[in-house]
Amino acid sequence: MSPRQPLVLALLVLGCCSAAPRRRQPTLVVFPGELRTRLTDRQLAEEYLFRYGYTRVASMHGDSQSLRLPLLLLQKHLSLPETGELDNATLEAMRAPRCGVPDVGKFQTFEGDLKWHHHNITYWIQNYSEDLPRDVIDDAFARAFALWSAVTPLTFTRVYSRDADIVIQFGVAEHGDGYPFDGKDGLLAHAFPPGPGIQGDAHFDDEELWSLGKGVVVPTYFGNADGAPCHFPFTFEGRSYTACTTDGRSDGMAWCSTTADYDTDRRFGFCPSERLYTQDGNADGKPCEFPFIFQGRTYSACTTDGRSDGHRWCATTASYDKDKLYGFCPTRADSTVVGGNSAGELCVFPFVFLGKEYSSCTSEGRRDGRLWCATTSNFDSDKKWGFCPDKGYSLFLVAAHEFGHALGLDHSSVPERLMYPMYRYLEGSPLHEDDVRGIQHLYGPNPNPQPPATTTPEPQPTAPPTACPTWPATVRPSEHPTTSPTGAPSAGPTGPPTASPSAAPTASLDPAEDVCNVNVFDAIAEIGNKLHVFKDGRYWRFSEGSGRRPQGPFLIADTWPALPAKLDSAFEEPLTKKLFFFSGRQVWVYTGASVLGPRRLDKLGLGPEVPHVTGALPRAGGKVLLFGAQRFWRFDVKTQTVDSRSGAPVDQMFPGVPLNTHDVFQYREKAYFCQDRFFWRVSTRNEVNLVDQVGYVSFDILHCPED
C-alpha cells in the first residue's frame, strides 16, 4: 500500500464528516381564520374568465383547448402575449388587484344610458372607511372628480342626500348590489354606468387598506409639525420605523416623525391615542382616565365590555359608575391589522410566537413572506393575529378609475391608461391622452380648460427644534368632536349600535319635539335592547329603567345617513346584529356603520302586491316574520329571501289582532301590532299566540303623562 494511501483515506473521511450543515427549514404554520385558496390554476382561470365577461359559463368542461379562445380574448384585452395558453404572465395578471367591472359586457342590474344627459353631476359620500381621516377621503374623491372636470364641461357638486347622481359607498362582501367583494386584494372596487337608481354609483371594498398609495395615513397631534401626518418609514437614532413608536420616551406615548429622517429634521407629532383624546361619547373629547371603574370592575385599557357593536371605549373619570362620562378610543391605521382573525384590532408588542418574543411585525411562520403580528401578547396561547398594514391602495387613483365608469367609460386595453382594469400606483396626473379622448367623445372638451388638481405637497421642515419629543404638559387636544354630548344610558355607554358610536340630540325640526305629542309613529323597533320610535326623519330611544322618559329626538340622517326620512318598519336580527330598515318598496341593511342598499323588495322575493313592509318579528335560527298587505312571510336573514310558500293571512297565526295594522314589532320578547294610537300585545303560551293586552303606545309603552 502506498504511504500516501492512508492520507487520502483520511482526507476523504474528513471531507465526508465536515460537509456543510443543512440549513434549518423555516417553521410554517397554518394561521387560524385565514382563507386559503384551493383553486387549481384552471379553476382560477375559469372563475376569472366568467367573472369578467370572457365566458358565459362558470365552469368549462374539457381539455385546455376549451379555454383557448377566451384566453386569447383576455390576453388581447389586457395587452398580454396572445398565446391562448394559461401561462405565467396570464396567471400573474389574473392574481393582480383590479377593478370589479367586467372587461366584456356590463353589470346587468338596470338598463342604463351610456352618458349623463346633464353636466352638473352630484355625488354623495354615503359612508366612510376607517383607514383614512374623513377630510382625506373627501379630498381624494374631490381630486378624482377634478381630473374629469378639467377635460370636460362636467362639474361635480357634493350633496348630502340619496338623490345624488353618484352615490359613493364603502362595503364588504355582499353589500346589496348582487356583485360581492372578495376580501382583501383581488377585486378593489366597482361602479355602474350612468342611469337612475344604483346606476352611476361607485362601491369600494372596505376590506382593503385604503391609503394614498404610499402606506397608512396617520395624523399627528401636538409635537412641532403642525399636525402633519406621519412619514413611514422614518429614521430615529439610525433605526428605521414603519409604525408609531414609544422608543426614546419614558412616558409610553407613541409618536412618529413627519419627515423621512427625524435625526436630521427633528419634526414629530404624537400618534392618535386615548391618552390624548376620545371621540364622540359625552365627555367633550377628554382623554381616557386609567384605571377606571365600570360595573364595579377596574379597567386599565379601553374595552368593548357593555357594548354590542364592538367599539372600544373608556371612562374619562376614575369611575364610570359614578360619573357616567365616557368617550370612544381612537384607532391607529399603522397598527390596526388587516384580515387574519382579528381584523380591526391593534398589534400588541411584544408578542410571543413559537416561544420567541417579537417587538415588531414579522414574516416568521409564513410561506408568502407577508408581515403579520399578534393582537394579544401571546399568539401561542390565544391564536389571535392579523396582517400588518402595507402600502395600501391609493383611494384617489381607484376612485378616479371608478368615476370614469360612472361617467360611461369602459375598460381600456392600454396598460398606461387610467381605465386599464389593473391597479398600479403612479405619481402625477394619471389621465392618459386616450382617457381624455374617450371622455371627450361622450361629453366634449372643457370650454374653459384648467389644469387638474394636484396633491398638496408635504410640508417641509423649518428650523429644527433642539429638543427631542416631549409631552405637552398643560395643553389639551385642540380638536375634539363637534357633536353635542349625549347622556350615556345607565347600563353603560351603548348609544345607537350602528352608526358612528354615538348620536347627539339634535335641534328640534318642529315645535312637536316631545315624543308624547306624536299620535302615530312611522315605525317602531327594538334596537340594542332599547325601543326606537321613528317619526318624520327623527327618532327617540326608550328603555325601561332609564328614568322612564325617552331620549331624543335624534336625526335619522345623523345615525343612519343612507335612510330616508319616512320609514315603514325596522328590526334588528339578534344573531348578527344587522339592522333592516324598510321604506316603500326598498330595504337597507346596516352592519355597524356599513350599509347595503337600497335594494328593491323584489330582491327579497316580495312582489308588487306588497306595497311596503309594515313590520317584522325576529324568530330563532336567523328567521324573521315579515308583514305586509295583511299577510306575513318567513324571511331567511342569511339568504335575504322570503319563502314564497310561506305567505299566509296574519290572523291565521295571530288571531285577535287587527288586520290593517301599520306597524308590527317585537319588544321584550312579545309581539306588538299597532293600529292608529293603539297596540295589541301578543304572548305565546303552549305554542298558541294570544292577545294579552290592548293599550296606548304613548301611555302604556312610553309612559307619557295622561293629561
Swiss-Prot record:
This protein's GO CC annotations: extracellular matrix; extracellular space
Main location: secreted
The reaction(s) this protein catalyses: Cleavage of gelatin types I and V and collagen types IV and V
Binding site for Zn(2+) 1: 175, 177, 190, 203
Cofactor binding description: Binds 2 Zn(2+) ions per subunit. Binds 3 Ca(2+) ions per subunit.
EC number: 3.4.24.35
Required cofactor names: Zn(2+); Ca(2+)
Domain of life: Eukaryota
Residues at which Zn(2+) 2 binds: 99, 401, 405, 411
Keyword Transmembrane: no
First-level EC class: hydrolase
Catalytic site: 402
Signal peptide feature range: 1-19
Function field: Matrix metalloproteinase that plays an essential role in local proteolysis of the extracellular matrix and in leukocyte migration. Could play a role in bone osteoclastic resorption. Cleaves KiSS1 at a Gly-|-Leu bond. Cleaves NINJ1 to generate the Secreted ninjurin-1 form. Cleaves type IV and type V collagen into large C-terminal three quarter fragments and shorter N-terminal one quarter fragments. Degrades fibronectin but not laminin or Pz-peptide.
Name the record gives this protein: Matrix metalloproteinase-9
Organism in which the protein naturally occurs: Oryctolagus cuniculus
Taxonomy of the source species: Eukaryota, Metazoa, Chordata, Craniata, Vertebrata
Gene symbol of the encoding locus: MMP9
